[in-house]
UniProtKB/Swiss-Prot annotation:
Its cofactor is FAD; [2Fe-2S] cluster. [2Fe-2S] cluster binds at C37, C42, C45, C75. Pfam families: FAD_binding_6 (PF00970), Fer2 (PF00111), NAD_binding_1 (PF00175). It comes from the Bacteria. The gene is tphA1II. Residues 3-91 form the 2Fe-2S ferredoxin-type domain. Keywords: 2Fe-2S, Dioxygenase, Iron, Iron-sulfur, Metal-binding, NAD, Oxidoreductase. It is an enzyme of class 1 (oxidoreductase). CDD domains: fer2, flavin_oxioreductase. This is Terephthalate 1,2-dioxygenase, reductase component 2. GO terms for molecular function: 2 iron, 2 sulfur cluster binding; metal ion binding; NADPH binding; terephthalate 1,2-dioxygenase activity.
Length: 336
């Protein structure tokens, strides 16, 4: 039988079916809660459980080390009774906001030896409405789907740009290397919760690993379009310089924000530019910053990268609510 999920201090309630995660039930009901990886890694969907009982969803952990004692991961649990939750935020979704399109490949080039820069065009007269930092689903012929962040800003709405890393054996990684101009893809968007507030004037530190740069590019291009004046630092990590594949974007932001700061973090010490940081992105954060109490950190990358940056930022005084993560996980339900 279905159980009811009640959101604390609101009139919102929605059903959770047997075998359905609380997060999926909320999204199905048109209620957006914070989330990213949907695999129990990022901790974004952690919510206080006030009343009721939960059970594991598909064998996933209902808590991880990022959860406070009374918190549960909404992606990893299902309702075993009626429950009441207190998420960090929530909002009603516009039922007309999410659209499914047949998009055409406009161009497909290599931005790096293992990264495809895939540009898609929408049908004539159609526009992709999304917010900076959100992602889309690519529906594959076998019924599976893969998620990728939009790298273009929302005002460039006649098409979509994706940065696709080639994962050995990856389902879409194999497909993308064969795509040519005129081929079509079945896409659906937008997905993902929005954490950054455009009117927040505090210093912003963006940390990316590899193609975690894609959503950050969308965010920074959007801030530039809005003429937001803010102290912004980008720490972008890769094994070698070829992984930092879009220097033109860095050059543009330096012109928009004279105070813009860029730190390249390279882990392959045998191929090190003179001005790069030798080491991981969390090392770069600790080296180049002091107290982060009045900062905002937006981090995009693998679960391990996000966790290492979260730990470093917390050690440096960043408040938990000022750390925003977009976790890239592989597989059918992971966000790439």
């Amino acid at each position: 039988m279905n159980h009811q999920i009640h959101i604390h201090d609101s009139d919102i309630a929605f059903p959770c079916a047997p075998g359905q995660s609380v997060l999926d039930a909320a999204l199905q009901a048109g209620i957006e809660l914070p989330y990213s990886c949907r695999k129990g890694s990022c901790g974004n969907c952690a919510s206080t459980l006030l009343d009721g009982n939960i059970a594991s969803f598909n064998g996933m952990a209902v808590r991880n080390e990022l959860c406070a004692s009374e918190q549960v991961l909404l992606c990893g649990c299902t309702a075993a009774s009626d429950i009441r939750i207190h998420p960090s935020s929530f909002r009603r979704l516009d039922p007309e906001a999410r659209k499914r399109f047949t998009a055409k490949v406009y161009s497909n080039t290599l931005a790096a030896p293992d990264v495809s820069l895939l540009r898609l065009r929408l049908p004539v007269g159609k526009r992709a409405k999304f917010e900076a930092g959100q992602y889309l689903l690519i529906h594959l012929d076998d019924g599976e789907s893969r998620s990728y962040s939009m790298a273009n800003p929302p005002h460039e709405s006649d098409g979509i740009t994706l940065h696709v890393r080639h994962v050995p054996g990856g389902r879409f990684s194999t497909i993308v290397q064969q795509l040519k101009s005129g081929d079509t893809l079945d896409i659906e968007l937008p997905f993902g919760s929005i954490a950054l507030k455009p009117d927040d004037a505090r210093p912003l530190i963006c940390v990316a690993g590899g193609t975690g740069f894609a959503p950050i590019k969308s965010v920074l291009d959007d801030l530039a379009k809005r003429k937001v004046q803010r102290d912004i630092t980008l720490i972008w990590g890769a094994r070698n310089p070829s992984g930092l594949y879009l220097p033109s974007a860095i050059d543009k932001w330096r012109k928009v924000w004279p105070q813009f700061r860029y730190i390249a973090a390279i882990t392959d010490l045998g191929d090190m530019p003179a001005d790069a940081h030798a080491g991981r992105v969390d090392d770069a954060l600790r080296t180049h910053f002091g107290n982060l109490h009045d900062h905002v950190v937006h981090c995009c990358g693998s679960p391990a990268l996000v966790q290492s940056v979260r730990t470093a930022a917390s050690d440096m005084g960043l408040l938990a609510q000022d750390f925003h993560a977009d976790v890239f996980a592989t597989g059918p339900t992971g966000h790439h």
